[in-house]
């Protein structure tokens, strides 16, 4: 990647105030980095403002949380330069041909040992060079009304996006009309468009209305969904899927292979946020018959089934979407095949869904209605749960309220491995890129302190893009021990120094360590040098012409520029030297 520098290490640092796990982390990290000369100016924005800025690379830096997936490629693909386009879905836009090559080799790897080695290599490279810096994985802590039962607790937390199972089978009463599930969101969803939604609030709603081809179970294993079975060719490039028969769209139209072919073909062709990454994997999608399709891949891809199950690739109805610009589709009245039908939405206030009576899983869902309410403040959401106005909330309960919840017999506290990887990112696409600064930041952040202060100790420090809690053996064991002095040293050697004493480092150019020369043994005894009197030195300087001084200055500037010292910094030094010489001349004349 091409180096992009700025005058000083000062960045606008955006954060979402309603997501405390990342927002509080942002405060702590800003203070930690200030100690090594990096200034992050915290600016809290609502998601309706912050997300468009991030998606269009109109930012300097930000703190946020990234939902996890058991598919390593879901994480790694976002670092491919092909996704460095506004609105495509990679917020941090890493542009490195070497990283691209590694990702492409991973996609094609068929040998497990080679696959493992490549994944280790790319994690180490990204950890030391990328503007994406992971901080910690949350531990999910969620409060729910005690009357609800038969929910599933799986990685990611209760009722998270991958947990369709709770929304299918949990209930609180034997009377169907009483099984109305009310959930509080801190902010409204951004989209009902399955092709373009990137936030987990939007995807939570979309996940209930639409279906993917495959899903994962509570053990993170791939299971059939709209696709009932599959076969893989010997060369690993062709996947043939049998589709579920008897499924209907919410408007009564039968679901067929045409819908699947349309969804993936147009999603990729129109470079939509959710499907764009598949352009590097899928060559084409073909209809075999009304209930059989083929995915023909460009190369073998070891994680393809997991990709389909966890990539949020929801199938849409061709008869509704054909001819639309899918990137601009507002989708005001979603029509899916999922367990719930869209009923009503008042933007900024609530969304209502109702049970799909013709859902293809018999007896599901048990819930008859879902009501999402927007309640911005964490304490207000908690009080609404206590009062029975809502049953739970979309994200984890604020840690400061958990102990209070444990004492209430009407509430239950559910813990699980968290879904959210809290991270910070810098805009390396248009604003700043210096891998040495990012490496220094890795050492300057005390992750244990961040976990403790930002999330009450509910979390796990993370140093690389993959982590053992979601990716098992594929996660690197690389760590960066908290060491602010090492961070300072890296910054100094990279040419970042605080030259004006304001606590923020400026760029003066990299320093080149000098290697002392080994003295040679003289062949003849040295004579004792005669030390000239001070006035003799000054007199000599007096006779130095202005032209000579200029020549010396020019020569020194030229020489040092070759080794990377900026001319501006050196010129200032020479001016100071000349002033000192003039003062010495003046003093010498006075003494005469």
Predicted regions and their residues:
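N-terminal lobe/hinge region of extracytoplasmic solute-binding protein
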Residues: 184-232, 265, 335, 455
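Ligand-site clamp/hinge motif
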Residues: 39-41, 46, 328, 358-403
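Ligand/substrate-recognition segments at binding pockets and active sites
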Residues: 1-68, 112, 140, 183, ...
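Detector for C-terminal structural segments
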Residues: 17-30, 52-181, 185-189, 199-205, ...
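Surface-exposed binding/hinge segments that line
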Residues: 146-147, 242, 276-321
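Secretory targeting signatures
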Residues: 1-4, 430, 441, 512-592
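Aromatic- and charge-enriched surface segment that lines or borders ligand/interaction sites
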Residues: 228-272, 288, 294, 381-384, ...
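Short, well-ordered beta-strand elements
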Residues: 7-18, 40-43, 177-188, 228, ...
């Amino acid at each position: 990647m091409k180096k992009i520098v700025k005058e000083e290490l000062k960045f606008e640092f955006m954060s979402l105030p309603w997501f405390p796990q990342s927002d509080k982390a942002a405060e702590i990290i800003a203070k930690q980095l200030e100690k090594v000369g990096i200034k992050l100016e915290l600016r809290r924005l609502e998601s309706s403002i912050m997300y468009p800025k991030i998606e269009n690379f109109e930012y300097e830096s930000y703190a946020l949380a990234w939902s996890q997936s058991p598919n390593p490629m879901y994480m790694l693909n976002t670092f491919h330069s092909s996704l460095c386009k506004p609105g495509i879905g990679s917020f941090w836009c890493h542009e490195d041909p070497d990283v691209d090559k590694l990702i492409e080799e991973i996609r094609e790897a068929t040998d497990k040992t080679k696959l493992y080695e490549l994944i280790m290599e790319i994690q180490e490279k990204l950890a030391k060079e990328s503007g994406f810096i992971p901080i910690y994985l949350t531990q999910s802590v969620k409060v729910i009304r005690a009357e609800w039962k038969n929910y599933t607790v799986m990685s990611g937390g209760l009722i998270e996006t991958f947990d369709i199972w709770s929304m299918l089978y949990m209930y609180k009463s034997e009377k169907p009309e009483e099984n109305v599930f009310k959930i509080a969101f801190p902010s409204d969803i951004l989209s009902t468009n399955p092709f373009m939604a990137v936030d987990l609030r939007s995807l939570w709603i979309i996940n209930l209305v639409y279906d993917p081809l495959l899903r994962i179970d509570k053990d993170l294993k791939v299971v059939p969904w709209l696709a009932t079975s599959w076969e893989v060719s010997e060369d690993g490039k062709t996947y043939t899927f049998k589709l579920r028969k008897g499924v209907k769209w919410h408007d009564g139209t039968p679901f067929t292979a045409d819908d699947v072919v349309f969804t993936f073909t147009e999603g990729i062709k129109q470079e939509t946020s959710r499907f764009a990454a598949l352009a590097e994997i899928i060559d084409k999608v073909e209809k075999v018959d009304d209930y059989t399709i083929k995915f023909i891949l460009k190369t073998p891809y070891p994680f393809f089934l997991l990709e389909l199950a966890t990539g949020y690739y929801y199938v849409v109805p061709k008869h509704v979407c054909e001819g639309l610009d899918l990137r601009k589709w507002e989708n005001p009245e979603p029509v899916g095949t999922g367990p719930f039908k869209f009923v009503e939405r008042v933007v900024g206030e609530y969304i209502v869904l109702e049970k799909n009576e013709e859902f293809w899983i018999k007896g599901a869902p048990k819930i008859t209605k879902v009501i999402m309410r927007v309640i911005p403040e964490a304490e207000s959401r908690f009080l609404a749960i206590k009062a029975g106005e809502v049953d739970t909330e979309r994200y984890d309960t604020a840690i400061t309220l958990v102990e209070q919840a444990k004492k209430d017999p009407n509430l239950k506290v559910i813990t699980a491995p968290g879904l959210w990887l809290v991270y910070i990112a810098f805009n390396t696409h248009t604003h700043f890129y210096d891998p040495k600064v990012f490496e220094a930041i890795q050492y300057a952040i005390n992750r244990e302190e961040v976990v403790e202060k930002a999330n009450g100790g509910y979390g796990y420090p993370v140093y690389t893009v993959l982590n053992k809690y979601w990716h098992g053996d594929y996660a690197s064991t690389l760590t960066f021990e908290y060491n602010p002095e090492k961070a300072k040293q890296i910054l100094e050697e990279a040419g970042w120094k605080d030259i004006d004493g304001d606590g923020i480092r400026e760029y003066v150019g990299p320093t080149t360590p000098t290697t002392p020369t080994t003295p040679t043994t003289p062949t003849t005894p040295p004579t004792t040098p005669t030390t000239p009197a001070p006035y003799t030195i000054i007199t000599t300087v007096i006779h130095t012409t202005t032209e000579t001084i200029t020549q010396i200055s020019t020569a020194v500037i030229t020489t040092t520029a070759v080794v990377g010292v900026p001319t501006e910094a050196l010129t200032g030094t020479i001016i100071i030297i000349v002033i000192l010489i003039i003062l010495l001349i003046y003093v010498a004349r006075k003494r005469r």
